[in-house]
Amino acid sequence: MAQLTREFLLQQEIEVVMEVEESRSKTITTKTYSSIFFGLQFNYIYLGWLVWYLHKDLEKARDYLYLATCIILDMFQRDEQHEAEIGSSLLGLINIHASWHALVANAPDLAVEVMKKTCASNIDQDKNFWWLAGECSIALIEGDESAAQGYCNHILNGPFPSRYAPTLRKNHEPFGKMFQAILDGNLEALEESTLAVARRNQGINTDGMSFYPHIFVLGVLKIAQMYGLEIEKYKPRYPKELLHLPKSDFSHIDRWWERIEIHPA
């Protein structure tokens, strides 16, 4: 079975490379720009996973993740609707697709690099959850617990823009509790908060998010592991609830957990 799976993934790698080459060879017009490059960034992310999982080629995986991030940034900088700023949902998408994948692939230095670039590009910093989450993650990865606590407090308690305050407080709280659990070294609280995020986002799209928080949780767990929290203790129960996602949209996600090396490489 393992050999069949490997052969299947090797074939997938070949097919995705062919898709990438085909997309890159197309004549790009304004009308097709977004669709072509949106597909490219997903393919680069998938290739990053494949080369890491199949060949343990971390350098190539980093290259693919970096390319995916650059494509997203370039695409939205060309988009008239986003020319003035990188909005909240986009910042989240960039951080999720590149930073958290890099974390899970044991490349925290790349994760920090991507987070810093995306956070620096965002104008609406005081209101943006993903900016706060990115800065909090950077601080944790770099060992600055004092700064991390400050960002965590902001995620949990605001200040939030007045007209959005009730909704933002409700939406941010379970995410903030994950960071707080890491800072407190509390495995039980981490498990409770991660499951709360998973349950809250099962099959729904809240604040422009659908499956993104689930990948975000995997990145947070990787940070928790850096702080000595033994996340493998509840591994058998956790993924089943976390990865309850619409099969038609992201059926591959339920296999990602099996590829995560619980112990750092």
Language-model regions, residue ranges each:
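Eukaryote-skewed repeat-based solenoidal scaffolds used as protein-protein interaction platforms
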Residues: 2-201
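Long, ordered, amphipathic alpha-helical scaffolds
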Residues: 175, 179-265
